[in-house]
Each structure stands twice: as structure tokens, then as C-alpha cells.
Regions:
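N-terminal glycine-rich anion-binding loops that anchor highly charged ligand groups
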Residues: 2, 11-57, 64-73, 293
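Short beta-strand segments at enzyme active-site cores
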Residues: 38-39, 109-112, 220
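A glycine-rich phosphate/pyrophosphate-binding beta-strand-loop-alpha-helix module
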Residues: 43, 92-148
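Acidic, glycine-rich active-site loops and adjacent beta-strand->loop/helix elements
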Residues: 83-88, 113-119, 158, 224-225, ...
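Glycine-rich anion-binding loops and their surrounding alpha/beta cores
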Residues: 2, 7-10, 16-17, 62-70, ...
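Active-site cofactor/substrate anionic-group-binding motifs, chiefly glycine-
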Residues: 50-113
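Short glycine-rich or small-residue beta-strand-to-loop segments that form or flank ligand, phosphate
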Residues: 12, 43-47, 80-85, 301
Length: 339
């Protein structure tokens, strides 16, 4: 196995690591015996060189192996819906809302997330503001999924090995590979994924990496005006991923029968502001751009799951989940569950 100095030298020479070397790199980064200065140098050198798909694949495989068990049955056909963040959009937590609406449509959702890192309000912050308790352990998370069709896996509970990296990332103060690893390392390893990426190049990188992971299907999306979500603002790129294969295409909100909106229409605030906005959509009270945005995301999730054959069919099904009260009832059921 390569030593930390050998890995650092290779990165400084701008030579890519093999997947096996990337796994060795993660082992060094998560080893408490690795000096913080060396861990910081390795992270900075990798970021400066630029991460490539074989490296990201090796890192993701290593992190998945280190993750704590979730207690969720293997092989469950569920989806994770997440954005990388980092797009500076200040939106109202689109991925969290999309995840709840998708679950209300009957597709099991295992959302993996954290507190705010690159936005004013992360997915854990958002759920708590909605009155939803974060499952305290794997047993509670699995029980929540079985009872409601939705659960949240709080990343620090399942990836303790990376705890020592957090202060190093904070000191560096720049984007590192961990900003894009999170969406790839859901500890339950659901076979379906809807991932938003903050740049087109990162979307392609994540798609190429997912093609080497044990998945069934995933969409990696980069939105109009640099958003890390599909939105009604404008056309968005979709990388359609299956094992060993990536197909790219451009889609428009009009394909889904959704009218365009401005970025200002999707503006968010703090956790309480965002919770009020999302609750209004799920209760059927807001029929504007916020609703359209969640309908669009849910339609994509339903397509990934093979539940629909036409874009507008997905929108109709998501609309019905709101108008029938199913989305509101899901939120109420989640609020009633203990941590």
C-alpha cells in the first residue's frame, strides 16, 4: 500500500491515483495517527490536481465500507434525493421537499444528509424546522422507513471515520473532494439516485463514478443558471446513469408541462422560512413556482424508479399526491414519530 508521502508526491506531480490508491488515501485521511498537516496537504494536493472518476470511485467504495450498518434491508428498491450544495442559489431546500413529495407518491425514500455546510439551511435543519425528529440511530431510521416510506440518515451517525477530517476541511476553507462524496456514500446503498450537482463538470464526474458503483439507475442533474437542482428556471442537463453506462441529455421544464420562473421565485431563507414554504406546498396551499419545482423533481424521481413512461405523467402523479392530501399526511406522520 502506498505511504502518505508517496501519495502526496504523486498528487503534487499531478499524476492521477488508481482506485486502489484512492482507497489507501481515504484510509490515511481517516486514520487518527495521520498528522493533520499531512491530511491537509493530501486534501489540498488532490483538489489542486483535480479529482477524476477512478479516484472518486475508490474514495466512495472505501467510505461505503467504513460506514456503520443502517438496519435497512438490503435490496430494498428505494431512492436517495440529494444536492451537492455549493451553488450559492439560496433556494428553499428543493431536494428535501422533492424527497418528501416522492415518498408521498409511494416510492420509498432513504435520504442521506447533514446540517448546513454550503447553504443557510441543510436537510437536517430543514426537517427539524418542519417538526420532524432526526432518527437517533439505525433502528429508529429503519422503523421510520417501514412505517412511512421515508427516512433520514444523518451522515455523522453513519460515517464516524470521517469526523477527524471535518476540522481540517474547516481550516482549509476551500472545496475538497468531500463536498461531492456525500451524495455517493448513502450507507443504506439504495439502488436509485437523483443527485443535483453545482457544476456541469462535477455532474459528469459524479455520473461516471456512479456508473462504477452497484446501482440500478441514477440521474445526475445540473440546472439552469448554475443551480444544483432541476428547476423551472430553464433547461437542465441530465446524466442518465446505469451500470457501466452514462447518457447525457438536455431537458426543459416545458417537457413536463411546467411554466418557467425566475430564480427570485425560488428564493429561500433560514430554516423556519423554508419550512413554512415547503409546508405550504405539501398542504396544497402554494400553487406557484415552489410547487412547480417540487413537481418537476418528483417527476424525475418517479421516472428513475420506473413508475412513469412520460414526463407529464410524473407531474400529474406528484400533483395528485399533494391534492389528495397524501403529502400532508406523510408530513403529519413523520412529525408524530419519536427520534
Amino acid at each position: 500500500m502506498s505511504t502518505p508521502r508517496e501519495l502526496l508526491q504523486q498528487l503534487l506531480e499531478r499524476r492521477d491515483l488508481s482506485p486502489e490508491q484512492a482507497q489507501a488515501l481515504l484510509a490515511q485521511l481517516t486514520d487518527p495517527q495521520t498528522p493533520p498537516a499531512m491530511a491537509g496537504a493530501l486534501l489540498a494536493a488532490l483538489s489542486t490536481k483535480g479529482v477524476v472518476a477512478p479516484e472518486l470511485l475508490g474514495l466512495a467504495l472505501a467510505m461505503r465500507r467504513l460506514a456503520r450498518p443502517t438496519g435497512i434491508p438490503a435490496g430494498l428498491r428505494a431512492i436517495d434525493i440529494v444536492g451537492t450544495g455549493g451553488d450559492a442559489s439560496g433556494s428553499f431546500n428543493i431536494s428535501t421537499g422533492t424527497a418528501l413529495l416522492t415518498a408521498a407518491c409511494g416510492v420509498p425514500v432513504i435520504k442521506h444528509g447533514n446540517r448546513s455546510v454550503s447553504s443557510r439551511c441543510g436537510s437536517a435543519d430543514m426537517l427539524e424546522a418542519l417538526g420532524v425528529a432526526i432518527p437517533a440511530n439505525a433502528e429508529a431510521a429503519a422503523a421510520c422507513l417501514a412505517a412511512t416510506g421515508f427516512t433520514f440518515l444523518y451522515a455523522p451517525h453513519y460515517h464516524p471515520a470521517t469526523a477527524g477530517v471535518a476540522p481540517i476541511r474547516a481550516v482549509l476553507g476551500v472545496r475538497t473532494v468531500f463536498n461531492i462524496l456525500g451524495p455517493l456514500v448513502n450507507p443504506a446503498q439504495p439502488p436509485l439516485h437523483l443527485i443535483g450537482a453545482f457544476s456541469l463538470s462535477v455532474a459528469r464526474l459524479m455520473a461516471d463514478t456512479l456508473a462504477g458503483l452497484p446501482i440500478e439507475r441514477a440521474f445526475v442533474v445540473h440546472g439552469a443558471e448554475g443551480w444544483d437542482e432541476p428547476t423551472p428556471i430553464g433547461p437542465f442537463t441530465v446524466f442518465d446513469v446505469r451500470p457501466g453506462r452514462v447518457d447525457a441529455g438536455l431537458r426543459s421544464p416545458s417537457d413536463y408541462g411546467i411554466k418557467s420562473c425566475s430564480a427570485a421565485d425560488l428564493a429561500g431563507g433560514d430554516a423556519q422560512d423554508n419550512a413554512r414554504a415547503l409546508q405550504a406546498v405539501l398542504a396544497g396551499e402554494d400553487r406557484g413556482a415552489h410547487r412547480d419545482c417540487l413537481l418537476l423533481g418528483a417527476a424525475l424521481a418517479l421516472e428513475i424508479a420506473g413508475e412513469t413512461r412520460h414526463p407529464q405523467e410524473g407531474v400529474a402523479r406528484a400533483s395528485a399526491a399533494i391534492d389528495s392530501g397524501a403529502a400532508r399526511r406523510l408530513l403529519e406522520a413523520l412529525r408524530e414519530r419519536p427520534a
